[in-house]
Design a protein with these regions (language model features):
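Surface-exposed binding/hinge segments that line
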Residues: 41, 144-195, 221-223
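Positively charged n-region of N-terminal signal peptides that target proteins for export
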Residues: 1-8
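A structural "hinge/loop" feature
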Residues: 33, 51-69, 93, 120, ...
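N-terminal lobe/hinge region of extracytoplasmic solute-binding protein
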Residues: 28-32, 46-101, 132, 212
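Extracytoplasmic/periplasmic ligand-capture domains
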Residues: 4, 22-38, 83-85, 104, ...
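Active-site-proximal polar cores
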Residues: 541
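A generic structural motif
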Residues: 106-109, 162-168, 228
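Bacterial N-terminal signal peptides
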Residues: 8-16
Length: 576
């Protein structure tokens, strides 16, 4: 979320695949997880595509999917995980856990004999260390926001080598979901953390063998602009029904592509094994499935959301230069006018070929438990948009150009990530409608990591079309919606809530997480969704369906909207 000059520089170096030999600790794996899937066979190279280069291999500080799509769940794992089909919490590095009667103490029993990919044993010390790092306010991680309970970070302690106890100030419904947090190795990262260098550790120029995890794969090679190669972790702790170690796949080559168009061409040429298909390509792919030896899956609406966000940050570096833009973007009527100018049906038709639904709420469309379907909606109407603009103090000059109360023409720039043709199409549709309202809109695509930098650290933008991954637990958005959140995009990391409605959201998230009964939680999160819909700090667009094309010889796949294709990567194998 790099400017071209930086991107050019990264092409200079190559991190080569390392042939690694480990001095493994002599420990017995006592609690292997055993698959219920069809027994597969070892071997084969899985080839898929990535949209853009990673920014870091440090899972703790990563906040963009170009990085987390490589690390999370593949190199690193949590104490618990969510099943990609049922979405239920399941054991991962912890084999089980106990909860006190008052719901404030959790005791996690770790799997004995699990090893890091370098052969060192995974123990409670690694869990404690990971929490120490997340708690450290000098480490810029969104995970800290999510783990706070009643404004406090949980108390945690090591009971013995394989037992960790965590205490929270009061019952907290999302707590187990928080334990999906990825654990990192103390023996590799303690020294950098102690010396104040943690945030620079495991960057993209790190020797692959230095990056150590418990996941099914390790980093084998990173060649900027070309590929990331993951190799099978020989020390992995999952097994099949015959006791053979997982994963089955030996190598996972992930080709770095510049656009969704390139990804589509790679699959059509038979160079990749599966593809997340754009709606505009789905029917064409379906017609050719038999001859292409692949099958198609429509798993329904994705959990991700796409939206337009405005720069309402008073720390915006261009505020003194262009203060009027801040006035426009903080004008509620202006934002509502833009919301009414969202032609979502055209977006669905042109960008998604009909494979999508309008998004009105910050809760993911498939989340039927917490989705509030009664929030305020802004059906497409340029007439209502004009009414809102008038109410907000705007008018039109003799040339039908929109001007503010000082007679200044409304002009700003909208950007999205280059290569994401769906977002580029949506952005063009929005820009066209706003031009019809008399605004002068400059729009352009930007490389993804550069986009994230503008949004999260430089704060140098007008409006951005971007998206967030979703989920089944609304508290996972506590790094976004509460005013102090690291991803509170329009005005991040506020010391005190900047508005009354933001203060109310802070309160609702606290109450929603503390409530025990689901019915009570729904009430709190319903109100939160209503506030976002009324105040429109972000304006939602449309949600695409999860569409996949998968080669027929890739077995044990169980694709879903929540888990995608790779949620059970350790079980996938190639048939002869």
């Amino acid at each position: 979320m790099k400017k071209i000059t930086v991107l050019t520089l990264t092409f200079i170096f190559i991190l080569s695949m390392s042939v690694m030999t480990f001095a493994a600790e002599d420990v017995e794996l006592k609690d292997p997880w055993v698959t219920e899937k069809t027994q597969g066979q070892h071997g084969g190279t899985l080839v898929t595509a990535l949209l853009g280069d990673p920014k870091t291999f440090n899972t703790i500080i990563a906040q963009e999917t170009s990085s987390t799509d490589i690390t999370d769940g593949f190199i690193f794992e949590g104490l618990v995980t969510r099943n990609g089909v049922t979405t239920e919490i399941e054991p991962e590095l912890a084999k089980d856990w106990d909860i006190s009667e008052d719901g404030t103490t959790y005791t996690f029993h770790l799997r004995e004999g699990v090893k890091w990919s370098d052969g060192k044993e995974f123990t409670a010390d690694d869990v404690i260390f990971t929490f120490d790092v997340i708690k450290d306010e000098d480490v810029p991680t969104s995970t800290r926001d999510v783990m706070m309970v009643d404004g406090q970070f949980p108390e945690y302690r090591k009971i013995d080598k394989y037992t960790v106890e965590i205490e929270i100030p009061k019952p907290f419904a999302p707590f187990l979901n928080n334990m999906t947090t990825y654990i990192v190795p103390k023996h590799k990262l303690y020294e950098p953390w102690k010396n104040g260098n943690f945030n620079e550790t495991w960057g993209i120029n790190t020797e692959p063998s230095e990056i150590v995890g418990t996941g099914p794969f390790t980093l084998g090679e990173y060649k900027p602009g070309e590929r990331v190669v993951l190799i099978r972790n020989a020390n992995y702790w999952r097994r099949d029904t015959e006791g053979k170690p997982l994963p089955y796949i030996t190598r996972w080559v992930r080709i770095i592509s510049e656009s969704q168009e390139t990804q589509t061409l790679l699959f059509e040429k038979g160079q990749t094994d599966f593809l997340t298909v754009r709606g505009i390509d789905f029917n064409r792919f379906k017609e050719k499935a038999d001859q292409g030896n692949y099958h198609m899956v429509d798993a329904g609406p994705t959990f991700s959301t796409n939206f337009l966000t405005f720069n309402m940050n008073p720390r915006n570096p261009k505020l003194e230069e262009e203060p009027w833009k801040y006035d426009w973007f903080t004008n509620l009527h202006f934002r509502r006018a833009v919301a009414y100018a969202m032609d979502k049906e055209t977006m669905i038709d042109q960008a998604l070929a009909g494979y999508g639904t309008p998004q009105w709420s910050p809760v993911s469309a498939p989340n039927k438990v917490f989705l509030n379907e009664d929030v305020k909606e802004y059906p497409y109407s340029l007439e209502k948009a004009r009414e809102e603009l008038k109410e907000g103090g705007f008018s039109w000059n003799d040339d039908d150009q929109l001007v503010d109360k000082d007679g200044r023409r409304v002009e700003f720039t909208m950007i999205t990530n280059a290569g994401n043709t769906v977002r580029e199409t949506i952005l063009n549709i929005i820009a066209s409608e706003l031009r019809d309202l008399g605004m002068k809109i400059n729009s352009s695509p930007v490389e993804f990591n550069a986009l994230v930098n503008k949004l999260m650290s430089e704060w140098d933008y007008d409006t951005i079309l971007i998206g967030l991954t979703g989920g089944v637990e609304p508290h996972s958005g506590s790094n976004v919606w509460p005013s102090h959140g690291h991803l509170h995009m329009w005005n991040p990391q506020q010391e005190e809530p900047g508005t009354e409605w933001e203060a109310r959201i802070d309160e609702l998230f606290e109450k929603g997480a503390s409530a025990v009964k689901t019915e009570e939680r729904i009430e709190y999160y319903n109100e939160f969704q209503e506030i976002i819909a009324e105040r429109v700090p972000v304006i939602y667009t449309v949600t695409p369906n999860s569409l996949y094309a998968i080669r027929d010889d890739l077995k044990n796949t169980e694709p879903t909207a929540y888990g995608g294709i790779t949620w059970n990567i350790h079980e996938l194998y190639f048939a002869d």
